[in-house]
């Protein structure tokens, strides 16, 4: 997950750069998996989850989204 300030954890979908990146990854996995991004209810985190067939690639994409969210919302 992406560690962010608690008051900004719900803002990830309002940031155009983050939203565009998430949409691009969703299109990439369309039909072969799914992308789920959500704010944690109990921690100052935005959870980044991707499902698909290539675990190494999924991990790489999830880390890059988490890093982007941390950079933009910290």
What kind of feature is each model-predicted range?
Residues 1-74:
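Phosphate-binding and adjacent anionic-ligand microenvironments
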């Amino acid at each position: 997950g992406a560690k962010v300030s608690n008051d900004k954890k719900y803002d990830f979908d309002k940031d155009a750069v983050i939203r565009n990146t998430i949409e691009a990854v969703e299109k990439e996995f369309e039909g072969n998996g799914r992308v789920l991004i959500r704010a944690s209810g109990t921690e100052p985190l935005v959870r980044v989850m991707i499902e698909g067939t290539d675990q190494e690639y999924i991990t790489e994409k999830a880390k890059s989204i988490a890093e982007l969210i941390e950079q933009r919302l910290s």
